[in-house]
Each structure stands twice: as C-alpha cells, then as structure tokens.
Amino acid sequence: MPVIDVQVHPFDRNHPGRPWASPSHGLDSATGEEMVAAMNRVGVDGAIMVSSFSAYEYDPSYALEVYNTYPDKFRVVTPVDATNPAIDDVVAKWAATPGARGIRIRMRDGLPMDADHPGLNRAFAAAAKHGLPVNLLCWGILDKGLPHIQRHRDTVIVIDHLGLLQPARPPVPADVWADLPKLLALAFDPPLCVTAPLPLW
C-alpha cells in the first residue's frame, strides 16, 4: 500500500524571482527536490502539496512547478480567496489544471468566516460541482467551521491540523486539546476527513 503524506507545504528560497509574501516559519526552503529526498529517506511514496499561503498567498505556481517536475510524486491543493467575485470561475479553472486535487479555505481574523458568507458558500459549492475536496483551516476556531461542514454535505471537507491551534513557535497553547471532543463528534459524519500533521513546537 502506498504511503501518502496528506499535507506538505513546498516553497523555494526567498529570492527576487520568487519573493515570499511573509517570513518563513524557520526553514530557508522546502523545495521539491528537498521534499523528494526527505520522502525517500523515510519511505513516503507521494504527497499532497498545499501551496504555502505564508510564502505565496493565492499563487500556486511554485507548487505546480514542483508537480510538473515530479508528477509521479505529488498533487496540489491551492488556497482560494472567497472574497473574489469570480470564485466560481477560479475553482472551475483550477479543477481543469493538471495535478490539481483540491482547494484550501482559510478562516481567521480578516477573512470571511460566517456560514452565510456568499463567497464561502459559492466556493464550497463549486468544489463539490467539480469534484474537489476542500481543505478547511479553522484551527482554534473550530466552532466557525462546523456550520460549513453541516451545510455543505455534498462537499468533501478536510479539517486541517485536527482543527487545533498549532502556532509556529512556543509557547504551546494552554489547552491545546480543548476542541478535540468537537472534532471527534464528527468522526462518523462523512464525507468529513481530517489531517493530523505534527505540531511545530
């Protein structure tokens, strides 16, 4: 059975040709070549690349570059902007992109979170229409994500990071497991999935 890492974030070193949108969490790079070497060392056969928002925001071109170099190793999930009036077309175009396997919706201060937000509803619906799972980042605010899960039953939703807040650096949150019972209550509620990456601290 192939071993697949369900969430890696590729990014090149910060340079004028591909500048970062914000500082790295610690690594100078996580290139395709570096990731393939690391995967080979531990017996991982393939990975789902979630384009790094901190490095490239809504631009998945670096992840696609890595996919095009290693099409037998990777598939790509791109962040999408639910405030974009053309979100339906964005998702449709992404679904037709070689290597595309999902979209990511981030929920946090400054971004839409409300269950009645039209852009969010259109993004979830478009993903279902085109057969794309939605990686939903709602860590630390799982209660904000639950209404979307309940509303969009036709969409495969993947809760990133178990829905638990995992800051890039210490200190560890005082009650990091507080929302786990809420997540476990959804365990038998298909088509929900979760990712469980290692904490960064």
Residue ranges and their predicted role:
Residues D114-W201:
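Catalytic pocket-lining loop regions of alpha/beta-barrel enzymes
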Residues M1-R122, A126, H130, L186:
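Mid-domain alpha/beta scaffold segments of enzyme catalytic cores
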